[in-house]
Amino acid sequence: MTDGPIKVNSEIGALKTVLLKRPGKELENLVPDYLDGLLFDDIPYLEVAQKEHDHFAQVLREEGVEVLYLEKLAAESIENPQVRSEFIDDVLAESKKTILGHEEEIKALFATLSNQELVDKIMSGVRKEEINPKCTHLVEYMDDKYPFYLDPMPNLYFTRDPQASIGHGITINRMFWRARRRESIFIQYIVKHHPRFKDANIPIWLDRDCPFNIEGGDELVLSKEVLAIGVSERTSAQAIEKLARRIFENPQATFKKVVAIEIPTSRTFMHLDTVFTMIDYDKFTIHSAILKAEGNMNIFIIEYDDVNKDISIKQSSHLKDTLEDVLGIDDIQFIPTGNGDVIDGAREQWNDGSNTLCIRPGVVVTYDRNYVSNDLLRQKGIKVIEISGSELVRGRGGPRCMSQPLFREDI
């Protein structure tokens, strides 16, 4: 099969093309009263966050990675006036709770904007003061202090979650929280309308109309035959089974097994990749807290049964044994966040010490603040490229969260 614009058959193959989103004014629309609803714990300082993100992007370029930006691709995808109109309608249709019937006024604002300005405005949010219409609905006479007609999307710089590259295809995800639900609209339009992608016949394993929640931070491509997916607060067992069935049904897909790993449902353990990432052929970072006592985990191996013409599900309780079996590796090494220390491990996991981005086998990008974990990685033979992230980390995501690989070399 000829390679298209998407090819990701592992977590560790040399990264050639990546999708990023530079933090924008959406971060300046974060205010203390509404942090919880927008899934933030703190307010990053935009100027510094942008400098940190620009350095992250430059590090990737210096390692031979082509960096694409979500906001630029999205603007290039709506050049056709009809597509632009449909895009606006789709965004507004998912914002009815805050728009309060002012679609036409918002469309009038959008009509004054270029394609890039439109995308940036939708991402950053529309404040009520930008529209300031006369009160025409009873709800507007109520004592409503909420400042937005269109909510900002401050989580967009975590490009890992709204979509996930799997093989030559992609999942366009239904996000768990309403605050992030609109984020996958952008990749939907990019895949369907951008010149780089639209004629490539990219398999859509799951689309955003799927009734079940799934997020890219839970989707790991361990090899061309094995996926690992976290059953988490944000990714449902139903979505994992649906994804497995769709992949097994596709003759172009090479994947034979889907390993579903249950993790605690809490913000601390937001996605599988916040506690577990693959960094070399036989090495994984891991947060010790998810291991419990080995032999006490809920792990499920989903395969296609050729005899019964349906999926089969086997249960396991040992993560190390399961990975060694499905990957055909004799001795998997787990490298614990913060060296497994009860204090260092918890602190560095909170600051995404497990959330490494592998750019080729044995070479990772990490936050410099997680020095205990980084030193241990080096002791285990891993090359660690450190970036600063004092502002970026306030969104509770690391280098893997901030990147969506579109193309990796096979291993």
Curated annotation (Swiss-Prot):
GO terms for biological process: arginine catabolic process to ornithine; arginine deiminase pathway. It catalyses: L-arginine + H2O = L-citrulline + NH4(+). GO terms for cellular component: cytoplasm. Pathway: Amino-acid degradation; L-arginine degradation via ADI pathway; carbamoyl phosphate from L-arginine: step 1/2. This is Arginine deiminase. Belongs to the arginine deiminase family. It is found in: Cytoplasm. Pfam families: ADI (PF02274). It comes from Staphylococcus aureus (strain MRSA252). Coiled coil: none annotated. GO terms for molecular function: arginine deiminase activity. Its main location: cytoplasm. Its EC number is 3.5.3.6. Transmembrane segments: none annotated. The active site is at C401. Keywords: Arginine metabolism, Cytoplasm, Hydrolase.
